[in-house]
């Protein structure tokens, strides 16, 4: 049994092949990258994909888009346009890549304007949902980040991602992000 089938048994063979191809591209592109804790960076899209699959129930196209987004975000020259992924996947990757270029600190946007910008860059609602799944993974991994980065991520989550999760009906994710926020915002409690 292969790794992709073991992780995503609900998908048909076409979906599994899509994920295998995307994972293959990402694992090559990200092979030398590590997270703040020294672990391979590929663990981040793996964890986001598990959230998207297990907790939200998104399609194989969304799982493939997670891997392709991470590969093309860091390495724009990564060839994901070979035609085998389809328009849906490319639309999602494009939306995720556009959102990743927005930095609320740089643009000095108010939270509401930033949320509107995220939604406007996400012509497809799956893009926003995947961005929330990504943020949940970041929140679950907060301890690997330096203190200032952690504080910024916690604040962004409270101001931006928790309200978005609520608006989209992702109540379990919203609640978990709130719990993590309160643990980190006021660790004495």
Which residue stretches match the model-derived regions?
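Active-site helical microenvironments for divalent-metal-assisted chemistry
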Residues: 1-189
């Amino acid at each position: 049994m292969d790794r992709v089938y073991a992780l995503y048994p609900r998908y048909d063979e076409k979906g599994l092949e899509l994920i295998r191809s995307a994972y293959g591209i990402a694992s090559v592109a990200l092979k030398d990258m590590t997270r703040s804790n020294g672990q391979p960076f590929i663990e981040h899209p793996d964890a986001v994909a598990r959230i998207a699959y297990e907790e939200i129930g998104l399609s194989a196209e969304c799982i493939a888009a997670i891997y392709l987004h991470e590969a093309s975000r860091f390495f724009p020259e990564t060839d994901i346009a070979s035609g085998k992924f389809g328009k849906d996947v490319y639309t999602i990757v494009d939306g995720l890549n556009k959102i990743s270029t927005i930095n609320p600190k740089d643009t000095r946007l108010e939270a509401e304007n930033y949320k509107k910008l995220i939604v406007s860059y996400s012509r497809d609602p799956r893009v926003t949902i995947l961005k929330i799944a990504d943020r949940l993974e970041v929140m679950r991994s907060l301890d690997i980040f330096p203190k200032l980065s952690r504080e910024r991520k916690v604040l962004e989550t409270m101001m931006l991602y928790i309200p978005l999760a609520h608006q989209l009906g992702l109540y379990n994710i919203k609640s978990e992000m709130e719990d993590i926020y309160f643990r980190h915002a006021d660790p004495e409690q």
